[in-house]
Amino acid sequence: MAGDVGGRSCTDSELLLHPELLSQEFLLLTLEQKNITVENDMRVNKDSLTDLYVQHAIPLPQRDLPKSRWGKMMEKKREQHEIKKETKRSSPADGLRKRPLIVFDGSSTSTTIKVKKTENGDNDRLRPQPQASATSNTFRKSSDSSSSVSPLVLSSNLPTNNKMEHGNNDNKQNHDLTHRKSPLGPVRSPPLSPVGATPVKLKRAAPKEEAEASINLKPPEAKRKIQHVTWP
């Protein structure tokens, strides 16, 4: 319920302070809610109803606060409370939302988009796909590589042949040295390693006669026990 007082719009709370602007039914209803008895004669007359309303039901002004520290603090709280009420009345729907609604029309294109660059860079991702010419080059390279297989195979066989020749030469030299150094008799040598295997070092076995001679040539003094000298 709202009205106009002096050419300006008034809220319901302000109208309660002006009972002459209220209707007769509203005055009766407020008096009944306040449990104020109204006689039948007064129900017909609006002036008597207004007098009763001013006497018992009109909202009284708030008491003046003292000019102390507590009074100033309470005045600030009242002002803040009134401001909050006004904001809730003006925008009840906006108060429920924590963030304002963002509406994109689609017509504005002035927005700028920032892209973060990674360490490796995204340029490789954005490159175009290779064309058909690149595929033809790969086929040519594969055909060239197939033609160059045979010389590579031959060259891979060369080092094995060289190793075999070197191994045979080493075996022959070792065999000649063993025959020259052992005048007493033939020396048993291990069987030759197969062709292509790793070369094995040959150790010359000492004959039995040389071993016995070395034992006999040892000085006899080494076998004597040490005699302890005793004083007389």
From Swiss-Prot:
It comes from the Eukaryota. One of its GO terms (biological process) is embryonic morphogenesis. The modification Phosphothreonine is found at T198. Disulfide bonds: none annotated. Residues 64-232 are annotated as: Disordered. Residues 144-156 have a biased composition (Low complexity). GO terms for cellular component: nucleoplasm; nucleus; tRNA-splicing ligase complex. Keywords: Nucleus, Phosphoprotein. Coiled coil: none annotated. Residues 64-97, 116-127, 163-179 have a biased composition (Basic and acidic residues). Residues 130-140 have a biased composition (Polar residues). Pfam families: Ashwin (PF15323). The modification Phosphoserine is found at S143, S182, S189, S193. It is found in: Nucleus. PANTHER family: ASHWIN. Belongs to the ashwin family. Component of the tRNA-splicing ligase complex. This is Ashwin. It comes from Bos taurus (Bovine).
